[in-house]
Amino acid sequence: MKKKLTALFAAALLSASAGVFATGVGPQLNFDPVAAPRITPPVWGLACSAKFDDIPLYFAGAFNIIAPYAYVKSDGTPVVTARLGFQLTADYWFMNPEIIGLWHWFWGLGGTIRTDFSANGKNFYLSTGPRAVAGMNWFFADGFLELYVQQAIQPELQFAFGEDGSANGVFGVPVYFPSSVGLRFWF
């Protein structure tokens, strides 16, 4: 009974706050090719994007996978595994003018923070950096549904810990080129 009451209270609170603020939330698919000192496969990710009217930022939280991911241990042994990670981005759009009718374009700047770990549990990665983003969006159903595509450039400062970083925090500067497509439902 207590769980049902808590769930009912949370639903009522969410409904009340949705009526006060316009919120856009929806799924996003990411494909992030990378330019790095060594050959690295692109990052694939599934994200949830969000925009709140009272905050001038577009947010996304993503689960990413890089597979296969290869590195060489300090003893020279090659290892092939996968990298799994979580990423948060926040972008400020400077413009979102109409091209024609439902079709708009946008550009802006933002930032990202990413944490990855190898599937074999031997490595941990921490990255952060700025990003520049541009894209197009379309609004349907009186602004209820937003479809968007975007492209970004995202240089990151990355620290590797564990076998891949010789256990001491090897520093790298990969440059990602994230491409995203997604939907936002506005309520």
In which residue ranges do the predicted regions lie?
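Gram-negative (and chloroplast) outer-membrane scaffold detector with strong preference
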Residues: 54-147
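Outer-membrane beta-barrel porins/channels
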Residues: 132, 145-147, 152-170, 180
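Short glycine/proline- and aromatic-enriched beta-strand/turn motifs that initiate or cap beta-hairpins
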Residues: 18-79, 184
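Cleavable N-terminal export/targeting peptides
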Residues: 1-24
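Short, well-structured alpha-helical patches and their helix-loop capping segments
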Residues: 126-128, 171, 175
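Outer-membrane beta-barrel "beta-signal"
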Residues: 173-187
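First exposed extracellular module after export/assembly in secreted or surface-exposed proteins
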Residues: 28, 144, 175-177
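Membrane-embedded beta-strand positions in outer-membrane beta-barrel channels/transporters
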Residues: 24, 45-49, 87-91, 131-133, ...
